[in-house]
Swiss-Prot record:
It holds the Pfam family ECH_1. It comes from Mycobacterium tuberculosis (strain ATCC 25618 / H37Rv). The gene is echA20. This is (7aS)-7a-methyl-1,5-dioxo-2,3,5,6,7,7a-hexahydro-1H-indene-carboxyl-CoA hydrolase. CDD domains: crotonase-like. Belongs to the enoyl-CoA hydratase/isomerase family. Its EC number is 4.1.99.-. Transmembrane segments: none annotated. It catalyses: (7aS)-7a-methyl-1,5-dioxo-2,3,5,6,7,7a-hexahydro-1H-indene-carboxyl-CoA + H2O = (3E)-2-(2-carboxylatoethyl)-3-methyl-6-oxocyclohex-1-ene-1-carboxyl-CoA + H(+). GO terms for molecular function: lyase activity. Keywords: Cholesterol metabolism, Lipid metabolism, Lyase, Steroid metabolism, Sterol metabolism.
Length: 247
């Protein structure tokens, strides 16, 4: 199954994404991912969740080819709702979520990582939003949780990427390790959290979300509204068609 949940150690659930070749996730799978993360947190035996991926990179965002081969706006609407559901599931998961990022993390991957509680990354990890090159907007909400405001704006306007070391400098990435040590690095954090009283940790997760100065769900939905405007204007289709022709 492309979205799987395993228990590498008692109290720790690893949710794995595996959509080769680049983990560009089709619409339905975003909902599957949301369900997997929510179910993990809802289980009283779970003390921490690790979000990880197999393959070349952590996440390449939505499946643009799926959108372009589907008539009308159905695939676009499903992808937007699916991303919203998955990002929200990570943010509202009842226990802390540790993102283990390997390789590229772009588009929707930023939404997942930005809403995670702790991030560990491989040395080759890169982060960015190519949205403006796809005729879309979105996940600036989450990128702004990873880097300062002006850097976020430059990255968004230019579709540039930053490496894991840069995010570690800003404190958003906890640890940078070799790719073969990534799973163990995520497990170390998960073990530290799992060793605490889960009743307190669950209360802390809820409390930290309540005092968050950024209303991430509403903010992201606002961004999606501009994406729909670009689609209605025909701008987004032009950029997605160009992307599909190049790929």
């Amino acid at each position: 199954m492309p979205i799987t949940s395993t228990t590498p150690e008692p109290g720790i659930v690893a949710v794995t994404v595996d959509y080769p070749p680049v983990n560009a996730i089709p619409s339905k799978a975003w909902f599957d991912l949301a369900d997997a993360v929510t179910a993990a947190g809802a289980n009283s035996d779970t003390r921490a969740v690790i979000l990880r991926a197999e393959g070349r990179g952590f996440n390449a965002g939505v499946d643009i080819k799926e959108m372009q081969r589907t008539e009308g706006f159905t695939a676009l609407i499903d992808a937007n709702r699916g991303c919203f559901a998955a990002f929200r599931a990570v943010y509202e998961c009842a226990v802390p979520v540790i993102a283990a990022v390997n390789g590229f993390c772009v588009g929707g991957g930023i939404g997942l990582v930005g809403n995670s509680d702790v991030i560990v990354a491989s040395e080759d990890a890169t982060f960015g939003l190519p949205e403006v090159e796809r005729g879309a907007l979105g996940a600036a909400t989450h990128l702004s949780r990873l880097v300062p405001q002006h850097l976020m704006r430059r990255l968004f306007f230019t579709a540039a990427t930053v490496d894991a070391a840069t995010l570690q400098h800003f404190g958003s990435v906890h640890e940078v390790v070799s790719r073969d040590q990534l799973d163990e690095a995520a497990l170390r954090v998960a073990r530290d959290i799992a060793a605490k009283d889960t009743r307190v940790i669950r209360a802390a997760k809820e409390a930290l979300n309540f005092i968050d100065v950024q209303r991430v769900n509403a903010s992201y939905r606002m961004e999606q509204g501009f994406t729909f405007e670009l689609n209605l204007a025909g701008v987004a289709d032009e950029h997605r068609d160009a992307f599909v022709k190049k790929s």
